């Protein structure tokens, strides 16, 4: 297995991973062909040096996991960098095999390579198993996060 940056050819498998998730079923539009908006967004992410869309590829060259890392420069922490990890998914038939932990350990190492002082994430409150998983890895619920859905 290996981690690598996603390519345009990976996009269908990535969106499928996002759409098969319990909450993703409500917000993603997986189909063949994929809606053009996914390609437009992929190109923006791919061109941004502070964004990394990552895939986990099996020995059989199948995409079995994905995540997105964003590196954010802040004035706080004396000009520190925060890494944000989002959209962490492992294909259903590969769950409970330690791959989620490998993926997060890889994300931690990548954040350290990029000189981030903090790796942060959010997990929906409807995912108690995921929250316990992140806590087991050392993440702390140190802040109360809030979101506002906008009309766009």
How would you label these PLM feature ranges?
Residues 1, 61-66, 83:
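Glycine-rich phosphate/pyrophosphate-binding loop shared by adenosine-nucleotide-utilizing enzymes
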Residues 2-16:
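A short beta-loop-alpha structural element at the N-terminal edge
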Residues 22-41:
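Conserved GNAT-fold acetyl-CoA-binding loop/helix
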Residues 43-55, 84:
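A short helix-loop-beta-strand connector motif used in the catalytic cores of GNAT acetyltransferases and
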Residues 55, 62-71, 89:
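Conserved beta-strand in the GNAT
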Residues 87-90, 96-109, 136:
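Conserved acetyl-CoA-binding loop-helix of GNAT-fold acetyltransferases
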Residues 101, 113, 125-143, 148:
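Conserved active-site alpha-helix within GNAT-family acetyltransferase domains
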Residues 104, 111-123:
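Conserved GNAT acetyl-CoA-binding A-motif
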